[in-house]
Amino acid sequence: MQTMEGRQYNYQDSINASSSMVVPHSPWHSPVPYLFGGLAAMLALICVALLILACSYWRLSGSAERDLEAGDDAKPDNDTNKTKHTEMPEKFLVIMAGDVRPTYLATPATRSEQSCTCGDHNEEEGRRG
């Protein structure tokens, strides 16, 4: 027995008391489960995103083979699919910028060779002379 600061201290009693009060150590007090749980959640999120991308690509490639708007529900032959391409006219949208907000939307003007006399020098010489 030892005396510490006026008190008696029995070293063997403290060892026996501490060994009898063993508190079970929970694995959730460590950061390791949270680390692996976060990594697993990120990996699952990436897998779900890749699965969605693959399904949307598969669905888009399947719809390109048949034309639903034309009423062709069955898959067409490869020969007829190649000859049915129709060209759509190109559409342009020009926004004329202003100081605060756009001033107006530009409308495309059709050019015809008869109305354009920009490069015709014969008419200019005829007017002058």
Curated annotation (Swiss-Prot):
Q: Which GO terms describe its cellular component?
A: membrane
- Where are the annotated segments for Disordered? 66-89, 106-129
Q: What is its main location?
A: membrane
Summarize tissue expression.
Expressed in the vascular tissues.
Q: Kindly state a single biological-process term from the GO annotations of this entry.
A: regulation of amino acid export
- List the membrane topology term(s): Single-pass membrane protein
Stretches that traverse the bilayer: 35-55
Q: Which cell locations does it reside in?
A: Membrane
Lineage, top-rank taxon, reads Eukaryota
Instruction: Give UniProt keywords alphabetically.
Output: Amino-acid transport, Membrane, Transmembrane, Transmembrane helix, Transport
| Topological region Extracellular | 1-34
Q: Cite the ranges annotated as topological domain Cytoplasmic.
A: 56-129
Composition bias type Basic and acidic residues, residue spans: 120-129
Which residues are the signal sequence here?
Answer: none
The similarity annotation says: Belongs to the GLUTAMINE DUMPER 1 (TC 9.B.60) family.
Quote additional remarks.
Answer: Overexpression of GLUTAMINE DUMPER 2 leads to free amino acid levels accumulation and plant size decrease.
Task: State the protein's purpose.
Answer: Probable subunit of an amino acid transporter involved in the regulation of the amino acid metabolism. Stimulates amino acid export by activating nonselective amino acid facilitators.
Tell me the protein's name: Protein GLUTAMINE DUMPER 2
Lineage of source species: Eukaryota, Viridiplantae, Streptophyta, Embryophyta, Tracheophyta
